[in-house]
């Protein structure tokens, strides 16, 4: 990759404590837990383990920062934008370190981690620009009255971050939240807290006042639950599984009816018609299934291929999988790293076993890769998969591509929609009528046409059905972090 700075294979671990009120502090109970390198299964470091008491401290810091008359509340909206621009500049300055640290903690290839940070910078700058433009309206009403709306921050937002894209998902949530003037409590995934803690130090350097940003590492069952049920948190944003998302929503509703944004599980279809460039479609379907080792909510694991090109597509897909470079994520030609931890590693292998037991044909992979440790699984390709198999219905979250035949457009639309999930879908064809029918009929939050895995700060992202509620990115995300206040007052005389 041209212009890619060299990675640091042994990045210094600079911050391992909880960040509250612009200070790094020990946990209230003094506990710590080990962070593991998925490439080696060895410990990277110990990080302070947050608890309910630490979440309470972070929320209290937010409450003080959000009081009327504080520097944060009195700050001009344009100044909030300047802080986000400054944060983006600091990300850019430290991009090699952030990418190296993300690679160490997640095992994802360095070049992928680098692209994640590039996207983070773009998102920060996009929402920096929105800070003084998220305005209300003047509304014509009957009689001698004047009406207008104000967009105000929700208040204290709890942001629960997943382990598959730690920096990316943190930025997707915190950038619009801060642009709108909220205070935040960030709970990174217990597996991947290191870049979030370093990011906290950059927030202070950028000039965010104390208490505006707080980062509390810890386990979801403790810290995540505490955020979801906290009576002083006004909004929770969660990315993770549908199963846990339901628990978050229940806790949010049964506590103080806090606002809830959920980006949840997916089982995304990729549809290939014979009029497309076959080599390009094979390559795109390959990346759709195997990007980030399949650890994506938008992973295109279900590939529906027209029956007239199916056998050739299977052949070329296997050839593509054999060429995928697995190994040291710091090597710039590495495309494939480990799964995040032992639990996920075991879960994926169990899914592969169940597919074979149910009659799917294993064409490539299906095993642990290498004998030097690490949670590596080979890129795995199955053919002759039926829609009623467990592996075709449930989210795998691993490097498994399922290749299935279809007859015609109506057939494949019905099969795409025959899922509890609705995160994303893709179609490869040159027929505009087919494209329009597909995009209108398929029930997903995003549809890619002749591409996959492209998103932009300006465009919203989120799921239908049990893939979630609300949207991240774009103008739509600002709605998730604002309250709309309607003001109506009598005037002596209205003139048009």
Curated annotation (Swiss-Prot):
Swiss-Prot/TrEMBL keywords: Eye lens protein
UniProt-recorded Gene Ontology molecular function terms: oxidoreductase activity, acting on the aldehyde or oxo group of donors, NAD or NADP as acceptor; structural constituent of eye lens
Keyword Ligase carried by entry: no
Signal peptide: none
Pfam families the UniProt entry points to: Aldedh
Database matches in InterPro entries: Ald_DH/histidinol_DH, Ald_DH_C, Ald_DH_N, Aldehyde_DH_dom
Tissue: Lens.
PANTHER family hit by this protein: ALDEHYDE DEHYDROGENASE-RELATED
General function of this protein: Omega-crystallins are structural components of squids and octopi eye lens. Contains relatively little if any DHAL activity.
Family: Belongs to the aldehyde dehydrogenase family.
Protein name (Swiss-Prot/TrEMBL): Omega-crystallin
